[in-house]
């Protein structure tokens, strides 16, 4: 008859997803009153649509599996696309790392702060940060030839003399991120930092970061890892999730608890 909160990031996705499903089943068979799956990093989130024929929509499949498993509620941080919430048949609490990042950016005391999005798809997220930080926004536009292969990139907006903070939901190979950072320095930016919620950091990511002109990459610990670059700094989501879980247990409004859930 207890409320059970299962905390499991799905990375690597397949093994950890299966483990989560088994834990949900175990809790259900033990007569748990409510089962909440706390998934800091939602694997397969980038498979949210069909970009070409004969490909799966992995995010929808995973949502179906979780919904059918007996879970009563999902809690996750910075989904790759907001519409993934609609894939589930159970309530989804979509939390935002801006609750952690905004304060950290404010503590930098940057004189000429401007927020940047590394692509057009992240412009909404960048605008939320800009509003919270009372800053302007610039957007990078890129032509991607294939996955993780970057074509030409341009900046919409001026960065000359600015301290740029790039905002994104995740960083994988860091190709887009470092190319954007170097382009901004070439266009007169004083400094470039990046805040990305999920640090996948695969392939040559660390090498790209070390070779680039980016000052610092700040990520959260939604994906457990040992980081091989002095440019990477990690912020824990533990207290953030703990406060959210406490609000759920007390039947309090999450949107009232966190400002970013009102954006």
Mark where each language-model region is.
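PRPP-associated nucleotide enzymes
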Residues: 1-263
